[in-house]
From Swiss-Prot:
<dbReference type="InterPro" id="IPR006195">
    <property type="entry name" value="aa-tRNA-synth_II"/>
</dbReference>
<keyword id="KW-0547">Nucleotide-binding</keyword>
<keyword id="KW-0648">Protein biosynthesis</keyword>
<dbReference type="GO" id="GO:0004829">
    <property type="term" value="F:threonine-tRNA ligase activity"/>
</dbReference>
<feature type="domain" description="TGS">
    <location>
        <begin position="1"/>
        <end position="61"/>
    </location>
</feature>
<protein>
    <recommendedName>
        <fullName>Threonine--tRNA ligase</fullName>
        <ecNumber>6.1.1.3</ecNumber>
    </recommendedName>
</protein>
<comment type="function">
    <text>Catalyzes the attachment of threonine to tRNA(Thr) in a two-step reaction: L-threonine is first activated by ATP to form Thr-AMP and then transferred to the acceptor end of tRNA(Thr). Also edits incorrectly charged L-seryl-tRNA(Thr).</text>
</comment>
<keyword id="KW-0436">Ligase</keyword>
<dbReference type="GO" id="GO:0006435">
    <property type="term" value="P:threonyl-tRNA aminoacylation"/>
</dbReference>
<keyword id="KW-0820">tRNA-binding</keyword>
<keyword id="KW-0479">Metal-binding</keyword>
<dbReference type="InterPro" id="IPR018163">
    <property type="entry name" value="Thr/Ala-tRNA-synth_IIc_edit"/>
</dbReference>
<dbReference type="InterPro" id="IPR002314">
    <property type="entry name" value="aa-tRNA-synt_IIb"/>
</dbReference>
<comment type="similarity">
    <text>Belongs to the class-II aminoacyl-tRNA synthetase family.</text>
</comment>
<feature type="binding site">
    <location>
        <position position="511"/>
    </location>
    <ligand>
        <name>Zn(2+)</name>
    </ligand>
</feature>
<feature type="region of interest" description="Catalytic">
    <location>
        <begin position="244"/>
        <end position="534"/>
    </location>
</feature>
<keyword id="KW-0694">RNA-binding</keyword>
C-alpha cells in the first residue's frame, strides 16, 4: 500500500497503481465529483495519473487556479475538435487556457463570423455529449513529425522541431482528434458543463506573435462549472464594455490615436487636465515623502544600453537612431539614466537613504496586435523611483514605500493584494542577501497586515519583488505598482558610497513604481470610475447653463467667479433647449450643473444639479464655491 500525504497533512493509504480519481473517491464522493486534477509532489497532473510511490497529493477543483486551467484547456481542445469537424483544410495553432477563459488559433480559408461561432458552439456541445475519453499519448520525435505531416499540421511540426532532441513528444487524443499538448486534461469531454460554455469573439493573431508570420484567426471562449457563473461573467463583460476606456475616451474628448503614430496616444485638453492633476498629486506626495526629482534624456548611446544589459536582452523592444555615426536608442526604461545621475556625485553613508524619482517618457516597440489603447501603448510615462540605502535601512524604506503606495491607492478607492516573488534558480547575489531581502519584505507586509501571495522562484534574477494587484469597481485585477530590490544595476554601474570605515561600499537599491505608466493608470481610472471622475480630477468641474439669452451675462459672471476660485467651469452658450444642455452635461459626466434663469438672476443664486443626486436646490454662488472647494480639498 502507498502512503499518500494530503494537503491537510493527513495520510491516506491506497493501492499502488491507483489513479488520482481513485484517491479522490476514497476520500469522499463529493471530492471525486468536484475533482478536475491534482498536484502530485508539486506537479500538476490529470485525474488519470497513476500513483506508484509514496507522495504528497493535493486534489484540485475548478476553484483552484491550476484546476481551472485544466478545465479550460480541455475546453480549448473541444473548440479545436469542433472547428476541424466543421471546416476543411484547417491548420491548428495553439490553444492555451488564459485568465477568464481560453483561446485557439486557426489557419483556415473561411473568414469566421458571429454565426460561425454559434455553429461551432453547437458542435462543441455535441462533442461534450459524446463524452469521448481523453487519452495521453507519447511519441518519438520522428513519429510525431510524420503523424502531423500526414495531417497537414505545419504549425505543430514547427513546434515539435523547436523542442529538444530528447524531449518527450506528448499528445492528447479524443475520438478522431489529436493535438500536440503537454496537458494535463480532464478524463473525458463530458466533464465540461455544456450549459456553462460560450464563445466570445474572433480576433486576428500573428503566428507566434511575429507580425512577419501568418495571420491566424483566434477564437476566444470561456467555460465554467455552473451556468450561473457564466451568466455572471457575461454580465461583467457587458459592464466592462460600458466602462471601456477607449469608448469613454472618445465620448469625453480625453484622447485619441492616429495612424501617423501607431500605439502612441494624443491627449486632448480634457485628458491633459486629468493627467496633470495626477502628476501634481504625485509631486506633492513625493515631496512630503522626501524624494528628489530628476529628469534624464530620452535618447542615450549604445554604450549605456550595453552596460545596463538592455542592448542584449531588450533590443527587439527598442527604437534606434544614429547620431554623428554613433548608435543611439530611445530609452525603454528610466533606470540606467538614474544610475548616471547617482554616479555624478560621491555619497557618504550619512546621505542615505537617498530617494530619487523621475516621471520619464519611455518608448517600447510592442507588436501591433498587442496594442490596446492606453493599457498597452508604445509610448508612456513611468513614475520610477530609485532609493539608495544602507543594508540596515532596507526594512524601514520598504515600509515607507508601501505606506506611499497605500496612500495613493486609498485616494482612488482601490482595494489591493500583494504578490511576493522569491529567488529563482538562477540568480545573482548570495542566499544570505536574498533571504535578508525576502524576510524584510515579508516582515513589512505582515507588520502592515497586508495579505500577500508568495510566488516561489518567480522573482527576477537580480532581486525579489512585490507586485500590487488592484481591484477595480467591477472586481477586475490590475497590476500597477512594483517594489523591486535590484542587485544588478548597482553592480553594472559600479555604484558606491563611503562607509563609516572610510571605504567604498555598494549601496542597496530599491526600484519602485506606483502608477506604473501614468497613461495606463489613467485608463484604469476611466474604467474604474466609468468616466465619472471625482471632483478634483474632473476635467470640467461645473457647467453653467443659462435658460435663455437674457441670462447669458449673469452666466458669464458666475463662470468668472468660479474660475477665480480655481474651479474649472464652462459656460454653455449654445442655442439649445435647457433639457438638451442638461442631458449633454450628464453624458459628459460633469459633476455640477448650474442652471440660471430669471429667479437666479434676481436673487443672485444658482439652481444646482449634481451628477449623482440630481436637483439639490438653489444656493448662493459663495455658498456653492465653499462647498465645491471643500469637496476638492477632501479628495481622500
Amino acid at each position: 500500500m502507498l502512503k499518500i500525504t494530503l494537503k491537510d497533512g493527513s495520510v491516506k493509504e491506497i493501492e499502488k497503481g491507483s489513479n488520482v480519481l481513485d484517491l479522490a473517491k476514497s476520500i469522499s464522493n463529493r471530492l471525486a465529483k468536484e475533482a478536475v486534477g491534482a498536484k502530485v509532489d508539486g506537479k500538476t497532473v490529470g485525474l488519470n495519473k497513476e500513483l506508484n510511490e509514496n507522495c504528497e497529493v493535493e486534489i484540485l477543483s475548478f476553484e483552484d487556479d491550476e484546476g481551472c486551467d485544466i478545465y479550460r484547456h480541455t475546453s480549448s481542445h473541444i473548440l479545436a475538435h469542433a472547428v476541424k469537424r466543421l471546416y476543411d483544410n484547417v491548420k491548428l495553432g495553439i490553444g492555451p487556457p488564459i485568465k477568464d477563459g481560453f483561446y485557439y488559433d486557426f489557419d483556415l480559408e473561411h473568414s469566421l463570423s458571429d454565426k460561425d461561432l454559434e455553429d461551432i458552439k453547437k458542435e462543441m456541445k455535441k462533442i461534450i455529449k459524446e463524452d469521448l475519453p481523453i487519452e495521453r499519448k507519447v511519441y518519438k520525435r520522428d513519429e510525431a513529425i510524420e503523424m502531423f505531416k500526414e495531417m497537414g499540421e505545419d504549425y505543430k511540426i514547427e513546434l515539435i522541431q523547436d523542442l529538444g532532441e530528447d524531449e518527450e513528444i506528448c499528445c492528447y487524443q479524443q475520438g478522431d482528434f489529436i493535438d500536440l499538448c503537454q496537458g494535463p486534461h480532464l478524463p473525458s469531454t463530458g466533464k465540461i458543463k455544456d450549459t456553462a460554455l460560450d464563445l466570445l469573439k474572433v480576433a486576428g493573431a500573428y503566428w507566434r506573435g511575429d507580425e512577419n508570420r501568418a495571420m491566424l484567426q483566434r477564437i476566444y471562449g470561456t467555460s465554467f462549472i455552473k451556468k450561473s457563473q457564466l451568466e455572471e461573467y457575461i454580465q461583467r463583460l457587458e459592464e466592462a464594455k460600458k466602462r471601456e476606456h477607449r469608448k469613454l475616451g472618445k465620448e469625453l474628448d480625453l484622447f485619441s490615436f492616429h495612424e501617423e503614430a501607431p500605439g502612441s496616444p494624443f491627449f486632448h485638453n480634457n485628458g491633459m487636465i486629468v493627467i496633470n492633476e495626477l502628476i501634481d498629486f504625485w509631486r506633492r506626495e513625493h515631496r512630503k515623502a522626501g524624494y528628489q526629482e530628476i529628469s534624464t534624456p530620452i535618447i542615450l548611446n549604445r554604450g549605456l544600453w550595453e552596460r545596463s544589459g538592455h542592448w542584449d536582452h531588450f533590443q527587439e523592444n527598442m527604437y534606434f537612431t544614429e547620431i554623428d555615426d554613433e548608435d543611439f536608442a530611445v530609452k525603454p526604461m528610466n533606470c540606467p539614466g538614474a544610475m548616471l545621475v547617482y554616479n555624478n556625485n560621491m555619497y557618504s553613508y550619512r546621505d542615505f537613504p537617498l530617494r530619487v524619482a523621475e516621471l520619464g517618457k519611455v518608448h517600447r516597440h510592442e507588436l501591433s496586435g498587442a496594442l490596446h489603447g492606453l493599457l498597452r501603448a508604445r509610448s508612456f510615462t513611468q513614475d520610477d523611483a530609485h532609493i539608495f540605502m544602507l543594508p540596515s535601512q532596507v526594512e524601514e524604506e520598504l515600509e515607507n514605500v508601501i505606506n506611499l503606495v497605500d496612500r495613493f491607492y486609498s485616494v482612488f478607492g482601490f482595494n489591493y493584494y500583494v504578490e511576493l516573488s522569491t529567488k529563482p534558480e538562477k540568480a545573482m547575489g548570495s542566499d544570505e542577501i536574498w533571504d535578508r531581502a525576502i524576510n524584510a519584505l515579508k516582515s513589512v507586509l505582515e507588520k502592515r497586515g497586508i495579505k500577500y501571495i508568495v510566488n516561489e522562484g518567480d522573482g527576477a534574477f537580480y532581486g525579489p519583488k512585490i507586485d500590487f494587484q488592484l481591484e477595480d469597481a467591477i472586481g477586475r485585477s490590475w497590476q500597477c505598482s512594483t517594489i523591486q530590490l535590484d542587485f544588478l544595476l548597482p553592480e553594472r554601474f559600479d555604484l558606491t558610497y563611503i562607509g563609516e570605515d572610510g571605504q567604498k561600499h555598494r549601496p542597496v537599491m530599491i526600484h519602485r513604481v506606483i502608477y506604473g505608466a501614468i497613461e495606463r493608470f489613467f485608463a484604469l481610472l476611466i474604467e474604474h470610475y466609468e468616466g465619472k471622475f471625482p471632483l478634483w480630477l474632473a476635467p470640467r468641474q461645473a457647467v453653467i447653463i443659462p435658460i435663455a439669452d437674457r441670462h447669458m451675462e449673469y452666466g458669464k459672471d458666475i463662470t468668472k467667479q468660479l474660475e477665480s476660485e480655481g474651479i474649472r467651469a464652462d459656460l454653455d452658450q449654445r442655442n439649445e433647449k435647457i433639457g438638451y444642455k442638461i442631458r449633454d452635461a450628464q453624458l459628459k459626466k460633469v459633476p455640477y450643473m448650474l442652471i440660471v434663469g430669471d429667479d437666479e438672476v434676481e436673487n443672485k443664486t444658482v439652481s444646482v444639479r449634481t451628477r449623482e443626486d440630481g436637483d439639490i436646490g438653489s444656493k448662493s454662488v459663495a455658498e456653492l464655491v465653499d462647498e465645491i472647494k471643500v469637496e476638492i480639498d477632501d479628495m481622500d
